[in-house]
Amino acid sequence: MELTPREKDKLLIFTAALLAERRKARGLKLNYPEAVALISAAIMEGARDGKSVAELMSDGKRVLARHEVMDGVAEMIPDIQIEATFPDGTKLVTVHQPIA
C-alpha cells in the first residue's frame, strides 16, 4: 500500500488518538502528544461527518477538560490547527484554548 505523506500523518494522528482514548478510559491523565492527537482526530472525524468549520471550532473545546490532562498540558496548547478534509475540500480549522 502506498500512502502520501499527508495520509501517513493522518494515520499517525489517528493511532495516537486511539491510544489516548484507551488511556483516558482507564482514568489516566493525558500528556501533551496524547491531548493534541485526541483533539485533532475529533476535528478530522467531524469534518468527514460534514460539520462546519465553526461547529468544529466549538466542538474542539469540548473534547478534553483540564482535569483530564497532566498538570501544565492545557497551558502548553494555546491553539490547535488542523487541515481537515470536508465534503467540499480541505480547510484549516483553528481551535483556540482547546482545553478549558
Swiss-Prot record:
Name any one Pfam family assigned in the record: Urease_gamma
Where found? Cytoplasm
Example GO BP: urea catabolic process
State the protein's name: Urease subunit gamma
What keywords are assigned to this protein?
A: Cytoplasm, Hydrolase
Main enzyme class: hydrolase
Q: Which reaction does it catalyse?
A: urea + 2 H2O + H(+) = hydrogencarbonate + 2 NH4(+)
EC numbers, comma separated? 3.5.1.5
Q: How does it assemble?
A: Heterotrimer of UreA (gamma), UreB (beta) and UreC (alpha) subunits. Three heterotrimers associate to form the active enzyme.
Coiled-coil stretches are none
* Record's keyword annotation contains Hydrolase: yes
The organism is Leptothrix cholodnii (strain ATCC 51168 / LMG 8142 / SP-6)
What would be an example GO MF term here? Answer: urease activity
Q: Does the keyword Cytoplasm apply?
A: yes
The UniProt entry's sequence similarity note says: Belongs to the urease gamma subunit family.
Q: In which pathway does it act?
A: Nitrogen metabolism; urea degradation; CO(2) and NH(3) from urea (urease route): step 1/1
Gene Ontology CC = cytoplasm
InterPro entries, sorted: Urease_gamma, Urease_gamma/gamma-beta_su, Urease_gamma_sf, Urease_subunit
